[in-house]
Amino acid sequence: MKRLIALLFATLISAFFLSGQTLAADLQAGRDYKPINPPLPATKGKIEVLEFFSYGCPHCSDFHPMVSQWAAKQGKDVSFRRVPVSFNRPEWARLSRIYFALEATGDLAKLDTAVFIAIHEQRMNFKTDEAVVAWAAGKGIDAKKFGEALASFSMQSKVQRADQEATAARISGVPAIAVDGKYLVNNEAAGNYEELLKLTDAVIAKARQERGGK
């Protein structure tokens, strides 16, 4: 019985990896993904997946719970990084600064989802830094520390670098996913967010094969 269970388990694992390889083999450039040329700088040792997003984007708000769960289940050879973009819109640039400021103060895990809710469900007015800081203070974080981070030059620099990265990846809308610095997953090839993540899995499998992995 133990040998039978072990055999069944091995068969399932084999089928899982073969499925990923088959999906990768079925991918078509232009239809399922767009090559990023020139490629973005790649991380050594790991396949980096970038999610370009904005707190101001309602689609990003809907996508956030799903992509967060998906990212937590990725293998050790995959790293996940979020990139807030502004598309040179001042109101979105402030939202990008909110993300980086929360990250800098260690409060991102606590308030990340809350920012989406505040904007898209509670219709909070985040048109000034003062309004943002007052809201954050009401959520129990250090207002002085967060306010200083939000207004710092380093946050502005991070926003600029994030926008430059989005431009280099040829991002025209969000949410958008780039894989291994070389492939931009085509949202139009997916009918919904679940399919988008499955397509992303296939592109990751392609990148893994190209790196010599299985």
Label each region the model flagged.
Residues 2-89, 205-214:
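Extracytoplasmic thiol/disulfide redox context detector
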Residues 56, 67, 71-75, 102-106, ...:
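Sec/Tat-exported extracytoplasmic proteins
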